[in-house]
Amino acid sequence: MSQFNVILASSESTVVAEYEPHGSRSDAYQSEAALEDAFIKLLSEQGYEYLTIHDSNALISNLRVQLEKLNKYNFTDAEWKRFFDHNISNANEGIEDKSQKIQEDSVQVLKRDDGTSKNIMLIDKKNIHNNYLQVINQYTENSGNYDNRYDVTILVNGLPLVHVELKRRGVALKEAFNQIDRYQRDSFWAGAGLYEYVQIFVISNGTHTKYYSNSTRFSAIKERENGKRKAQKTSNSFEFTSFWADAGNKIIPDLVDFTKTFFAKHTLLNILTKYCIFTSERMLMVMRPYQIVATERILNRIEIANNYKKMGTVDAGGYIWHTTGSGKTLTSFKTAQLASKLPYIDKVLFVVDRKDLDYQTMKEYDRFEKGAANGNRNTAVLTRQLENRANCPHNR
């Protein structure tokens, strides 16, 4: 495996600024077990706690401990049973409901024994380093259609939010993709259904490593059930998996390099809490590295303009150049969404130079979040929108 060397990085940046692998990549035989051991060792060195959890009971027990620690609250046994059965492992909820819970409803209400209510965070999105990361491997599920044993899973506050499937070097990467596909069909839903909380999947054969959202996999299952067979690329296909990269868009394919960048704790937590979008169509999208870089550079420019009193000047501006089909609308949506949460931002304006772009952009924004944007046809409407304090994000 290559050696990783960070040339330039910022504690605030999700994507490493520049990286340069040293040494030649090993093509020597390495078993899947050896690759898995090396991966877990590297995660442990990066601050992940390794746990020997191989069954549902141990996973649920650890989940209770981690949620108690995150929320600084000890459940009674009766409270935990109610909260787990209704809020976490509800038999009527599937992958989409659980994705919505993580992305939009991560604070759940506990009904306490004394009749009062308490907010319980599943994940802390404001202070990401309050979240606790653990790694488990060879988890076994025996209550599905078939017995399955999963490779490596990342737990965030006890919930499995990232799953990694490995193949030995030389094996086609798509085999790992197909294996996760089988797990979804046969066993992720089984038992308490906690593996339906997985937001991001990572597949690697050591030499090449990619990631994708749970919707990429889940859509494939639904499409098969509906009897659809499409020749073109769809969002559920292997082609919609993504490589990780540095800020210069240099791909980081090797598992060691990928682990030191993508699985850096602040990077992974930022991706999970900021750079996933659960759309109005109930699909989960995870942004690509160049989209994250563009978003953070725009936000950084806004911060600098505010801190150095450059608002309203040319120095406060800038531009991002992305090619056709690169997902510019999604980048602009996420940028606007995050910018609107800044305490000194009241309104975010999005200006296009063609009417067809206006319609297309509004349609896409509505897909990302219903009612997220308001269009206008003349300056009178624009004036009313700007003067309407009720629509300011901090007044909602």
Predicted regions and their residues:
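Glycine-rich and small/hydrophobic secondary-structure elements
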Residues: 350
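Short beta->alpha hinge that forms the Motif I/post-I loop of the SAM-binding pocket
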Residues: 353
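Conserved motor-coupling elements within RecA-like helicase/translocase cores
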Residues: 381-395
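ATP-dependent helicase/translocase motor core
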Residues: 2-347, 356-372, 389-393
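Acidic/polar loop patches that form or flank catalytic/metal-binding clefts of enzymes
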Residues: 372-379
